[in-house]
Swiss-Prot record:
UniProt-listed SUPFAM superfamilies: WD40 repeat-like
Family annotation (InterPro entries): BOP1/Erb1, BOP1_N_dom, WD40/YVTN_repeat-like_dom_sf, WD40_repeat_CS, WD40_repeat_dom_sf, WD40_rpt
Positions of region (Disordered): 1-141
Organism: Cryptococcus neoformans var. neoformans serotype D (strain B-3501A) (Filobasidiella neoformans)
Ranges: WD repeats: 481-520, 523-563, 660-698, 701-740, 744-783, 799-830
Location(s), subcellular: Nucleus, Nucleolus; Nucleus, Nucleoplasm
Residue stretches of biased makeup (Basic and acidic residues): 131-141
Protein name: Ribosome biogenesis protein ERB1
Keyword Hydrolase: no
Record-level GO cellular component terms: nucleoplasm; PeBoW complex; preribosome, large subunit precursor
Length: 830
């Protein structure tokens, strides 16, 4: 802090300089500069100030000499006045310094020096010089002043080797660990008391009021006042805490310190405060709740006679209120309008109290709900009920053996010929008590009666007779020998033949009209899993699935010669080419640990219509044809990533469309008009683009396990059946979730199928029934499909919990073919 500038006329130094000879102008200037240098040295060279050059000093000295020569008459007066005022000013400055010392003692400032300190230092030096030079002549004073201010400068100023400028005084300087050559100051530990400005409960952990969970993953719990880490103390488990409470008597007088994360012992004063708080007493032991009352402002001779306020009365006290005027005018307006009738005569009270009048009934509370009425007595509660209400001995014994909670009634009906013979009811008090409990304990709810027309809740659907034709009765039955279970059935594209696959390993072809078996193939490879006719009308191809093998069949003797020739050409062309081998696709189409083999049957089998064998991994469970009749896809759930295979009959090639199957594939289907492929897993249906080889969309079925699937001829709708008795209709233009979910079967659904040309679809279930529905799909995208239930067909028997297994529509006709576990294939006609 730089020293304050010295004022001429008030500072003793200036007076002393003025008392010196006028020729000492330069010495006067040096004296002032010397005092500034001494003050700078005293304050540790904190303010360097601005140095004056010799030229400037000479100019200043010349100016002062000129001023002295210009006004010589003031010099003698100033000398005399200075001598007279010296004693008075010294006394004043002494008083001022004493007062400043008192103020500084009371001050709480802790930082450096202030202006009063500097003035006190200047005043002390001036006082000493004035006391010594009081009786000296002017020449002696001037010589002493010149000698005092003519001092050689200290060359050591500015050459301090200290790097750290830490404040000296409290604490000790130690070398810094982080900055080389620097020093930091360490302070001794102190114990805060009531006289200290800090808290009396100073904690070694200085992290403050923060959540201690921030340190859960760290080995320390905070920092002390010197910045050192406070490591986490050892923590015992619950057993250690229990043993400490049992063995350590001081454990009950300790509390957990959240900052230090350890138990600290409570002092006697703290325990005394806790005991007082438990007893609802004042925590201060020195507090006297019964100290005598000291009447400071009451009692004789202590009354206050002066008013608290002598302000004059406001104007509003004696001026009429305009707000009251507005209220009165509002009442006057209401009287004029007739809304308020003054002096209205009170109603006359009736002379006699009308006991039958309803005038005294008050309106109940808005939340009031009357108690429910007791049910009226029934015929069984009569003292003379009819004979059919009286229990038999077996019913009495059964009623007495039941628990009270399981009994329908709390009494047994009894018969008396007269009312006077009826004894007292022993459960009367118990029933009234339970009634009272229900009245004040059971919550009540108010049910709002809805007046809804029941017809408005039922959708307006056309009558089934308006939607004919559809199958209504079973006309032909195709019985299999031994009532073997028929797993699959299929109809030829011309609607003349029916193919069925049973568990005896035989594929049979039936005449649709008369029910006669016209052809059969015994594949000797276990149960027939699935059969499917090719949709091409130019050929007559049938695919049958058995364990590990696909058989391509054709009843050549039953079809026209040109159809038979086209069928043989299509299936055997690949055998005639040089590239055809018994292992088609081993290195080209199918890549995996197992290869697909296309083999030619024996000569005898070819005469019977067995055209091609395809050996595949796993057991295929479903086959579906492409609309052109050259490609067909099979599903084998137990074949891992080769569960879905797409085969081409003309080239005898097979390929797997999926490198990794997305779940267990249950059913697959080709899109009727686009190169798209549907794959249904247990819960999802995925639509793939075979040309672009990408996933288009995923449909969420909302069922637990998909069992069957079929695609509408338009391609924008599909239905699925599930083992949890649900049928879901998807409108792919609408949403990825089902448009309708129907649950009308009592057991699992086994098969669902659309009619290829008519607006019909059907579903078969293990409950032995087949449900027929009408479905109209509109070309207008703003109109939802119309679904109308038409008929429930019953005829198949349920064997071992299995009913109807498969169904197919007859092309071009409203007829349906179904197969069941009872060994029958039925034709349902309109």
């Amino acid at each position: 802090m730089a020293p304050q500038p010295l004022k001429v006329g008030t500072s003793k130094l200036s007076k002393m300089v003025k008392s010196a000879p006028k020729t000492a102008g330069k010495s006067k200037k040096r004296a002032v500069e010397q005092v500034s240098e001494e003050s700078d040295e005293e304050f540790g060279d904190q303010g360097s100030g601005i140095d004056m050059s010799d030229d400037e000093e000479e100019v200043d000295g010349d100016d002062e000499e000129d001023e002295d020569e210009a006004f010589p008459e003031f010099d003698s007066e100033l000398e005399d006045n200075d001598q007279e005022e010296a004693s008075d000013e010294e006394q004043d400055e002494q008083d001022t310094s004493d007062e400043s010392e008192i103020v500084e003692e009371d001050s709480d400032s802790e930082s450096g020096y202030n202006t009063s300190d500097i003035e006190r230092m200047y005043a002390s030096d001036d006082d000493l010089s004035s006391e010594e030079n009081k009786d000296l002549p002017v020449d002696e004073k001037l010589s002493r002043l010149i000698a005092k201010n003519t001092v050689k400068p200290d060359d050591s100023i500015g050459t301090d080797d200290k790097i750290s400028r830490a404040k000296e005084g409290v604490g000790r300087l130690v070398p810094s660990k982080h900055v080389k050559g620097s020093f930091v100051r360490e302070y001794d530990e102190y114990e805060a008391g009531y006289g200290s400005e800090s808290s009396t409960e100073d904690n070694p952990n200085t992290v403050g009021n923060i959540p201690m969970e921030w340190y859960d993953d760290l080995p320390h719990i905070g920092y002390d006042v010197n910045g050192r880490k406070i490591f986490r103390p050892l923590q015992g488990d619950e057993l250690d805490k229990f043993l400490a409470n049992v063995e350590d008597p001081s454990a009950w007088t300790s509390a957990e310190d959240k900052l230090l994360q350890q138990n600290v012992q409570l002092s006697d004063k703290e325990l005394d405060i806790i005991r007082r708080l438990e007893r609802a007493e004042n925590p201060d032991a020195d507090f006297d709740p019964y100290q005598p009352t000291i009447e400071w402002f009451t009692g004789e001779g202590k009354e206050r006679v002066m008013p608290l306020s002598a302000a004059p009365e406001p104007k509003r006290r004696f001026v009429p209120s305009k707000w009251e005027h507005k209220k009165i005018m509002k009442i006057v307006k209401a009287i004029r309008e007739g809304r308020i009738i003054p002096n209205k005569p009170s109603a006359e009270k009736p002379r006699f109290y009308p006991i039958w009048s309803d005038a005294d009934q008050h309106n109940p509370h808005v939340m009031y709900m009357p108690a429910p009425q007791l049910p009226p007595p029934k015929t069984a509660e009569s003292y003379n009920p009819p004979e059919e209400y009286l229990p038999t001995e077996e019913e009495k014994a059964e009623w007495e053996a039941m628990d009270k909670e399981d009994r329908k009634t709390d009494f047994l009906p009894e018969k008396y010929d007269a009312l006077r013979k009826v004894p007292g009811y022993k459960n009367l008090v118990q029933e009234k008590f339970e009634r009272c409990l229900d009245l004040y304990l059971a919550p009540r709810t108010r049910r709002v009666k809805l007046n809804i027309d029941p017809d408005s809740l039922i959708p307006k659907l056309p009558a089934p007779k308006e939607l004919k034709p559809f199958p209504i009765a079973s006309t032909v039955q195709y019985r299999h020998p031994g009532d073997t279970r028929v797993r699959s059935v299929s109809t030829s594209p011309d609607g003349q033949w029916i193919a069925s696959g049973s568990e005896d390993g035989v594929v049979r072809v039936w005449d649709l009209g008369n029910g006669r078996e016209v052809w059969r193939w015994d594949l000797h490879a276990g149960p027939i899993q699935y059969v499917e006719w090719s949709p091409s009308r130019e050929e007559s191809l049938l695919v049958a699935l058995v364990a590990g093998k696909i058989a391509v069949l054709s009843p050549l003797a039953l079809v026209a010669p040109h159809i038979a020739a086209q069928t043989l050409t299509h299936s055997n062309t690949a055998f005639a080419t040089s590239s055809a081998t018994t292992k088609q696709g081993a290195g080209n189409e199918v890549k995996g640990i197992e290869s697909v083999k296309w083999t030619r049957p024996s000569e005898r089998e070819r005469e019977r219509g067995v055209l091609v064998y395809v050996e595949v991994p796993g057991t295929p469970k479903q086959v579906t044809w492409h609309r052109k009749g050259d490609y067909f896809a099979t599903v084998a759930s137990d074949a891992a990533n080769k569960s879905v295979l797409i085969h081409q009959l003309s080239r005898h090639g097979s390929q797997s469309p999926f490198r990794k199957t997305p779940g267990t594939i249950q059913r697959v289907a080709f899109h009727p008009s686009k190169p798209h492929f549907f794959a249904a897993t247990q819960r999802y249906i995925r639509l793939y683009d075979l040309a672009a080889q990408k996933l288009i969309r995923t449909l969420q079925s909302g069922v637990k396990w998909i069992s069957s699937m079929d695609v509408h001829s338009g391609g924008d709708n599909l239905i699925i059946g599930s083992y949890d008795k649900k049928l879901a209709w998807f409108d792919m233009d609408l949403s990825a979730k089902p448009y309708k979910t129907l649950r009308y079967h009592n057991r699992a659904l086994r098969s669902v199928a659309y009619h290829p040309t008519l607006p019909l679809f059907a579903s078969a279930s293990d409950d032995g029934t087949v449900h027929i529905f009408h479905c109209t799909v509109y070309t207008d995208l703003m109109q939802n499909p119309l679904i109308v239930p038409l008929k429930i067909l019953r005829g198949h028997k349920v064997i071992d919990g299995i009913g109807v297994l498969d169904l197919r529509w007859v092309p071009g006709k409203p007829w349906l073919v179904s197969s069941g576990a009872d060994g029958e294939v039925r034709l349902w006609c309109s």
